[in-house]
């Protein structure tokens, strides 16, 4: 399949590389030309613009930071689109924004899917991402061979915007989960109990989770190297809260978690991994 790929950051670069490994013909574009070099070295073609990335391709994928970026690149995609093109955005944006962008592309004759992912940099590199897709059955069928190169758990959640709803729900669970593990560790340490032993005990019971297993170990190792930056999780939780406000939905746990991530960014931890919420808790409780 001929695929254009736009956005080559922490997530986009390994995702595009996995498409190349799957024997797809990949054309890449990124705002920073140097981001394209690893893909060009691996056999991808370079594009001069989003429109150029769309031209002559069957599928175009974007993996960028936020809704304005998605809207901008998709306007370019529409300019370079050929009949039958499917455009897939795998970024995390608000469901309402995904629906709006989808409607704009439909007016230009482009079928659009929102297909955000979960699994972080590790999953992107391994090709084991969870992919949550929203859009038509026909678009999903066209995009699925590409999805299978990038992920293992691939779910067509529903119509346009449904993928972003699922991703927002994912961010609620993961945000609270990371905060819960960090609070448990802060609680243990303040009581003079070894955090590693507490984690070991919890892993054998009903408190087990992948977050406790994987991120808990990284907290113990003080490894805050970003696989998913705190400012990005803050952005995602703000999407949750904005959508909840629009719907008149009460989400007290999400609200508290969002405030913690807002505080992380405000205190200079935005470029570190989301598990650096442990650092914030340590500062607030006199453990730093």
Enumerate the language-model features and the residues they cover.
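Residues in the short beta-alpha loop(s) of Rossmann-like NAD(P)-binding domains
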Residues: 31-32, 66, 136
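Active-site-proximal catalytic alpha-helix in oxidoreductases
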Residues: 126-134, 155, 159-191, 203-214, ...
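NAD(P)-dependent dehydrogenase/reductase Rossmann-like domain
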Residues: 266-288
